Amino acid sequence: MTAPSQVLKIRRPDDWHVHLRDGDMLKTVVPYTSEIYGRAIVMPNLASPITTVDAAIAYRQRILDAVPAGHDFTPLMTCYLTDSLDADELERGFHEGVFTAAKLYPANATTNSSHGVTSVDAIMPVLERMEKLGMPLLVHGEVTHAEVDIFDREARFIDTVMEPLRQRLTALKVVFEHITTKDAAQYVRDGNDYLAATITPQHLMFNRNDMLVGGIRPHLYCLPILKRNIHQQALRDLVASGFTRAFLGTDSAPHSRHRKETSCGCAGCFNAPSALGSYAAVFEEMNALAHFEAFCSLNGPQFYGLPVNTGWVELVRDEQQVPENIALADDSLVPFLAGETVRWSVKK
């Protein structure tokens, strides 16, 4: 029997979905991403959303100012779509290399999404412009109607929003972000080359029992919410198959400890410190390490039409404990898998 590999060497990966926040939080979390990833698609849902070219340029500079010396990292900026967004502004940002993609948040679907889109019809001229430009649309795929059960929001979104949109704009490039259900996995698998998906480590590693059985675990609470195990298994099967239109998107979403551990806690897992090793562990469990590099480093650039990174990253089989917390200006951050032992670590 062949001994398990002790080192995994892959092209430098990219994170195709990350929240870097702003202010002191940004300064704290950026290095965890910039150390490992060559590029990252940065979410625009700040308290004042990124809806203009100037705002994106200023935010990109704040991110770059927080990147430690020696880290080779490029933030890829996104535009927050609103009902009143100017299509000309979006096109200008895309042509000037400021906006890589635009993000569709259904209004009130997640953190800082109150400015989001009330209906796809309201932004159809913008989406038609994006289709012509070849500009990717990044979608938080959940309906937010009060009568829809939170565990059904993603499947309902496919039927009522995603499929009608893609039928109407057949050449629009769409990333179905952080998919969580067998419905979404099958939908993306059955789709054409204009449709891709990102998948988080938490949705591959855990299901709702892990969050709710034996006590509630607020640091596993994210949106879209963890689903039952049949959905988790469908996501695992998708990536283990070597499907090329699924790629790494951590959705790392930091909140201070007191905003997570409270009677009405915020959604989001701060997984940047341990995400790559977490993905490696999942692929190893599924005997799918042959597809690990493509998921992390090749599939995303292929969909976005970007070159792969030139550098390399090594992960070593070296059990390490994830810190219980990370210092923040007036509080602390509890990282994903805090206090737990992880099997794979990025070689420094």
UniProtKB/Swiss-Prot annotation:
List of residues that carry N6-carboxylysine: K103
Residues reported in the UniProt entry to bind Zn(2+) 1: H17, H19, K103, D251
Catalytic residues identified in the record: D251
Cofactor annotation: Zn(2+)
Catalysed reaction equations from the record: (S)-dihydroorotate + H2O = N-carbamoyl-L-aspartate + H(+)
Pfam families (alphabetical): Amidohydro_1
Superkingdom assignment: Bacteria
InterPro entries cross-referenced by the UniProt entry: Amidohydro-rel (IPR006680), DHOdimr (IPR004721), Dihydroorotase_CS (IPR002195), Metal_Hydrolase (IPR032466)
CDD domains named in the record: DHOase (cd01294)
Residues that hold Zn(2+) 2 according to the record: K103, H140, H178
Biological process (GO), any one: 'de novo' pyrimidine nucleobase biosynthetic process
GO cellular component: cytosol
Annotated substrate binding sites: H19, L20, R21, N45, H140, L223, H255, A267
GO function term, MF aspect, one: dihydroorotase activity
Cofactor detail note: Binds 2 Zn(2+) ions per subunit.
Keyword set, alphabetical order: Hydrolase, Metal-binding, Pyrimidine biosynthesis, Zinc
EC number(s) stated in the UniProt entry for this protein: 3.5.2.3
Protein's job: Catalyzes the reversible cyclization of carbamoyl aspartate to dihydroorotate.
Family of this protein: Belongs to the metallo-dependent hydrolases superfamily. DHOase family. Class II DHOase subfamily.
Subunit structure: Homodimer.
Protein name as it appears in the record: Dihydroorotase
Organism of derivation: Salmonella agona (strain SL483)
Taxonomic placement: Bacteria, Pseudomonadati, Pseudomonadota, Gammaproteobacteria, Enterobacterales
